Every structure is written in C-alpha cells, then in structure tokens.
C-alpha cells in the first residue's frame, strides 16, 4: 500500500505534446492522464496530465525515495526535460526537415523509463514488422511483467525475471529462437551487474559481444533508453528505404549510406531521422538533400 506521494509540475522546454501510450500495454491513458507502474525495486504508480501550460506528475509508492525515482523516470520517458530547441533553431530552414520542424516543433523520440526496457524491446523488434513485435511485447508483459497492487497495470519484465527464463518459455511468446537466446543472455549480464546500462559506451561494447545483438539494437537502446539524440538506428528498414529514395539510388540504401546521409545533422542525427520519417509519412515523399552544417547553422 502506498504511504508516500510526490507531486510536481514541470514546464517542458519549448512546444510539447504527450506521446501516444504505445502498443505494449505498459503505459495507459486513463481519464486524460498517462499512467504506468515503475519498480525500483519498490513499486510506484505514476500519472502525468496537462495543467495550465505544464505537466503534473504524481507518484504513489511505499517510500518517498521510490516515488521520487518514479517521477524522475517518467519525466525522462515523456521527454519533459528534453530540450530540442537548439536542434529546431539550427535546422528550421533545412530543405528536408525545415517545413515539418516549423509546423510540428514538438515531435520527440519515444523513450522508455528504463534502459533495460528499451534494450529488451529492441531485441524483440529485430527483423520483424512492428505489429508482430508489439504482440510479442504484450505477451512478455502478461507473462513476466510485474503487476501493480491494484491489479490493472503491469510493468515491463525485469532483467532478473527474464534471466531465469528458458529459451522455450520465450519462444512460446512468439520470439524467434535466436532472439530468445539474445534476450536471456543480455538479461543475465544486466541482472548480474556485468553490464551497467548507465555507462553507455562500455555497455554497448559488452552487449555487442552477445550473438544477435548488433549496431541497430545498440542504436535503438541508445535513442529510446539512454536519451542519445546522436544515435540513429540506421539499419531500420524505414531509413534504408527513405535514404535510397531521397538520394536517388534506385534501391535501398546501405547502413553506411544512411549514416553518411544524416552526418550533416550531427549531433542530432536521430532527431533529424524522426522528423524526416514524419515528413515522409504525413505529406508524402520529401524532396531535397540535407543542408550543410554551415548553411543550416
């Protein structure tokens, strides 16, 4: 039973809109508020809703420390401290992303409150369509996620829980054998403390030693779980297709060509990618080439 409540109002830097709850069933929209349960390891239920130009966070937990941790993780996940104004100012007249930057300057990458959640979900998303990946994630949450005291919310599975799973158990959630092995190995490394996801580069190096974990998984972890706007998941099929079209290649681009295409946007390659994909999906194919750093600055 919750004995501590922490409530605070935050004013996001620049234009802001709530992200969608997603399709894994962890973050819920209820009565105008985004709600989820977070463990540290104590359980906290945290809610977020708009109030007079700000966002109010309210966390209830057994201890004040757990409630504070939950609000900190929720503000990261919702991008409430994510200041993209320098990026917008620098590239607002870019021929590719300038128009959508001026129309929708609130777009931010989807984030996860815990880096392990981003890592686990990136592994489930390898080489499959998004709908199937979401179904796998929902199955993992139902089977291994930690339930809230009220019984209506579930957190994503903890690394300690997945570390104890057998390959066949994860395969029963429709995860391919190789992905199941990778998820178990990664979970064991994190649970044992051999991989510290708060230490970005050292963690990436150790994760890359695990079979079936490659650059795309690391870049997805970095962007969605570690707040790295410079880490574009360049191997994503959407980027391979988009760059192939924009660069006039007549084929899908290679990963190296995607990285080269987005190099002028450094250190905001991932932000540029988010906006470029939105421009492509919302208004049809975008046209042009990136501005040089000098011209866009």
Model-predicted regions and their roles:
Residues 1-297:
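HhH-family (HhH-GPD) DNA N-glycosylase catalytic core used in base-excision repair
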